[in-house]
Amino acid sequence: EEVFFRGYLQQQLGARFRSPLVWMGIPSVLFAIGHYQPAEAGENAVIIVVWAGLFGVLMADLTARAGSIGPALAVHFVNNVTALLITSLPDALGGLALWHTPFGMEDAEQLRAWLPVDFAMMIVSWLAARLALRR
């Protein structure tokens, strides 16, 4: 995902347009739309798209600041390892996880209670990567 959305699409749009709304926004919106799964997520599908859109904007920011997709790729890798191999939802992608949550993507009440923690971890990961880029 990072190679296409940040490594290719963001770079191509950045070479053609000056506005960050274009070269950060378009790849982030497309990234978010790619995470729309109403069959699996039910009424949570839209909030998951919002989560993915914010994640896309943060990764676009890292790519722009670093001048390479390396930091965004690293943060995305850590996010996916955590979500798929450490603690996962009990769905088709969670088969290798060490722990499963007691709720699935379609459980609106439980997932919405958990999402603020996930949003906070996303922001902390982004800030840590930005701090590392300063050094």
Where do the PLM segments sit?
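Transmembrane helix-loop-helix hairpins at the membrane interface
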Residues: 1-135
